[in-house]
A protein has these predicted regions:
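Active-site metal-binding loops of divalent metal-dependent hydrolases
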Residues: 66
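Residue-level marker for buried hydrophobic side chains located in beta-strands
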Residues: 60-62
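Flexible, D/E/H-enriched segments
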Residues: 1-58, 69-153
C-alpha cells in the first residue's frame, strides 16, 4: 500500500510540530472498493466512539494532493469538482467524480474512508480552509493542487 499512499511521512512532521508528543495510528491504504471504503470508515468510527473518551481527544486526518501536473486552469477546474464532493461529505460522489473526470488525486481512497468515518460519526458539514496550487508560489505551466478541509463531528 505504501507505493500509492505516502501521506504519512508528509504529514508526520507537521503533526509533531503542532502537537508535540502524541500517539498515532497510521493507516496506509491502496486500492479499495467503495464498499470496502465504507466498511473501513464505519470501523474507524466505531473505534473512535469506543476510545475517544477513554484516551482523550482523538483526531482523524486524511491527506492527499488533488490534481497533478496540469495547467493551472485545468487543475482549478478538476480540483473544484473533487472539492465539491468532499465539502458535500459525499464519499461515493468523490470516488465517482475522480474516476469519471480522471482526476489524479493520489489519496482518494484515504479521503473516501475518512468521509465515510466522518459521516458515521455524525458530521454535518465540511469547511474549505484553503485551496491553492504549486503555481501560486512561483509561476509554472504544470501545477499540483492542494486543499485543506476541516470536518467537525
Amino acid at each position: 500500500p505504501h507505493l500509492h499512499d505516502h501521506s504519512i511521512e508528509v504529514q508526520l512532521p507537521f503533526l509533531q510540530r503542532v502537537l508535540g508528543e502524541f500517539t498515532f495510528l497510521p493507516i496506509s491504504l491502496s486500492h479499495l472498493s467503495a464498499e470496502e471504503c465504507r466498511e473501513l470508515g464505519q470501523a474507524i468510527a466505531q473505534v473512535y466512539e469506543a476510545e475517544n473518551s477513554a484516551v482523550g481527544k482523538i483526531v482523524l486526518a486524511a491527506s492527499s494532493d488533488l490534481s497533478h501536473y496540469l495547467s493551472p486552469k485545468e487543475t482549478e477546474r478538476l480540483d473544484a469538482l473533487a472539492l465539491e464532493a468532499i465539502l458535500a461529505l459525499d464519499p461515493p460522489g468523490l470516488l465517482r467524480t475522480v474516476e469519471e473526470e480522471n482526476i489524479s488525486m493520489c489519496g482518494v481512497i484515504p479521503t473516501t474512508v475518512f468521509l465515510f468515518a466522518a459521516k458515521a460519526l455524525g458530521a454535518k458539514q465540511a469547511r474549505l480552509l484553503k485551496h491553492c496550487h504549486s503555481g501560486d508560489v512561483a509561476p509554472m505551466r504544470e501545477v499540483v493542487g492542494y486543499a485543506s478541509v476541516a470536518v467537525e463531528f
